Each structure stands twice: as structure tokens, then as C-alpha cells.
From Swiss-Prot:
Name of the gene encoding the protein in the UniProt record: csd
Family: Belongs to the class-V pyridoxal-phosphate-dependent aminotransferase family. Csd subfamily.
Protein name in UniProt: Probable cysteine desulfurase
Residues modified to N6-(pyridoxal phosphate)lysine: K236
EC number: 2.8.1.7
Pfam families: Aminotran_5 (PF00266)
Cofactor(s) this protein cannot do without: pyridoxal 5'-phosphate
PANTHER family to which the protein is assigned, alphabetical: CYSTEINE DESULFURASE, CYSTEINE DESULFURASE 1, CHLOROPLASTIC
Organism in which the protein naturally occurs: Streptomyces coelicolor (strain ATCC BAA-471 / A3(2) / M145)
GO molecular function: cysteine desulfurase activity; pyridoxal phosphate binding
InterPro entries: Aminotrans_V_dom (IPR000192), Cys_dSase_SufS (IPR010970), PyrdxlP-dep_Trfase (IPR015424), PyrdxlP-dep_Trfase_major (IPR015421), PyrdxlP-dep_Trfase_small (IPR015422)
GO biological process: biosynthetic process; cysteine metabolic process
Catalyses which reaction(s): (sulfur carrier)-H + L-cysteine = (sulfur carrier)-SH + L-alanine
Class of enzymatic activity (EC top level): transferase
Amino acid sequence: MTQLPGLLDTEAIRKDFPILDRQVHDGHKLVYLDNAATSQKPRQVLDALSEYYERYNANVHRGVHVLAEEATALYEGARDKVAEFINAPSRDEVIFTKNASESLNLVANMLGWADDPYRVDHETEIVITEMEHHSNIVPWQLLAQRTGAKLRWFGLTDDGRLDLSNIDEVITEKTKVVSFVLVSNILGTQNPVEAIVRRAQEVGALVCIDASQAAPHMPLDVQALQADFVAFTGHKMCGPTGIGVLWGRQELLEDLPPFLGGGEMIETVSMHSSTYAPAPHKFEAGTPPVAQAVGLGAAIDYLNSIGMDKILAHEHALTEYAVKRLLEVPDLRIIGPTTAEERGAAISFTLGDIHPHDVGQVLDEQGIAVRVGHHCARPVCLRYGIPATTRASFYLYSTPAEIDALVDGLEHVRNFFG
């Protein structure tokens, strides 16, 4: 068994994840390497969800009966846990959404409806990057189309890093908002937040960070990031699907208009006009994802019990080992950084002229689950002249043995298409 420095006790951790005991395709042990798409869920989260529905299920904020009060306490307690997890100055800065995509769309639409000085219009510019997930491209394209704003972006270097050589020309006095990913879901690249934020602040632009591939894997401190908005999702960090988070600075949330209207987000309503509740409820129209928020709170408890610093060290050791092993495979090309420095635990690659979908299918027959395609980042594939990639991604329960199984599986793929 391969021993690496900094590894967690994966034997103990894996006992918390029932699905990892599954066998697939005629008895092959499941090797789950698709964690950038979604993580598996520990029993502690599954139990929290079951307990909520069995004992506390009710609508929140709208009743004086015991179930409503208990459900509200659990829901708002989850908000407290998120605020502490990301070191938010105030719990009222934590908005629950259904996923990171909705969080980013919320920011774009708030700015589209805002009054000065936040309004995005035909005289302003929006800056993103070429490595973004479609969820951090399309909302800004829609906003630019609707307002006439100009959309600009940073390109990529050949080794999968952001090209910031022209940062002063891209982020200018016309820039209203800069939105970028903290860790790329396709390249694995960890971006230089400080340099981008510093330039944005120099010109008075707002900063929005997509932390979907960071929040599950490393300590996340929104105050240290010095961003104005930070978005992430729950299902990639051991939580259930259907729950996302948008953190925003209090003064911005007070000034910016709501996007969705409905129950709970109002203060008063007449047939002539409405006034709105303070944040975060101003941005949480209708019945919220109560059970999902409770599940996210349980996931945060679980991650905290292990320690985000330890999870980061574990994944760094795995990534370093995986890069080394993958580069030993003939004809394999890593798309993105080829070292473990300043990168996350998602590695995309091509294998000669074998289409990634064929690679993924043959690996699946061996019980190895990877992701194939554009990974909702088609501009990256266009930049590197490839139709798609195969992506392996790791988490706190991943092991060196699973990386070895992947490498052995790729040899089988090469022989199969030999």
C-alpha cells in the first residue's frame, strides 16, 4: 500500500460513506473519482436529513406551533454554521440558494436592476476569465446583452494559468464587476486572488468569486479574500443537492434590490407597492430549501470534525501522487498545471487520440467513475484545441490505491483501443 505524507485515516473515513462499499459491473469495487461533479454523503448527513423529515418537517418562519419553531431553529442554525465556516462577519450576509449557479445569477441580476453606483449599463464593463464554469459565463453574457455592457475576460497560458500580463488593460475605470473562479473545475488551477482583487479595488469594481471547487477542499475565509460576493454549493462538500450559498457584504445586500419576489422576502404588501425584508430574507423568496440547509449544516459539522487544513493536506498529497502517476502513462496529456502547486484535486487529461467518452466508458466497466466532456467549461477546451477531457477528481475519502486503479485502468483503455 502506497504511503504518502499528510494523508487522512481514509479507512476510518470511508466507513462513514455507505455508497463507497458498492460493487458495480459484475463485482468491481466502486472507485469514485468524480468528486468535482458531486461528493458522496456521509451517514451523518443522511441521518440528519432523515431525522428532519421524521421529526421536524414544517414550513419555516410562518408558524407558532412547535414543528414550525423547531424547523426554523434548524434552518437558521444551518445559516449560523455556514457563517462560521466561511468566517463571515455576520450571519445576515449568508443567503441560501439552490446551488452556486443560482447564487451567481442572483448577483448578476441584482447588479442589472441596481441603482447607481452599482448599476451595470452600456457605459460599463464586466470582467470574467476564460477558465470559468458556464455558470460564471452565461449570467454575465445575459447581463451584458440586456444592458449593453461590454464583456471582457482574461485568457489562459499554455500551462493552464490565468494570463494577467495585461491586468491593467482588462480591469479599468469602466469595470463594474470582476467575477472569477477561485479553483477551476476543469484545470484544477488555484487562481491568484490577491492580485485580481487589488486591481479591482483600485478602480472601484466589485469582486465576485465562485468558490464551488474551493469550499469543499480548503479553509475558506471570505474576509481574507476581500471579495464582495462569494458563491458555492452544498452538494460538492458532503451536503445534499438543492442547496447553495451566496455570501455578500452587508452594506451591499442592504443597498441592492431583490431579484425574486414572493413570500417571506417582503415587509409589507399592498395592491400599490411592497417593501422588502432586510437581508438575507430579502433574497430568499418563497419556501426555502429547509431540509437541504439542515443537511448542509450537518455536512459542515462533519468537515469541521476532520479539519479543513487536514483535508487540504490530504488532497495535496494525493494530487501530487496522481500527477506523477498520470504523467507515466504513454500518450497522456494533462490539461492544466502539471505540478501540484497552486492547484486543486481535479485533473483533466486526454489519452492520445482516444475520445474521452470512450475512455470514460471503458473505465466505468472496471468500476472507475470519472467525468468526461467539457465539464461546463467549453471555452477551455476550445483554447487548448481538444474536443473534451477525462477528469479525475479526489476528496477526503480518496486513496492512493484508487489512483493506482485509475492508472491501471488507463493502461487497459490503451490496450483495448490499441
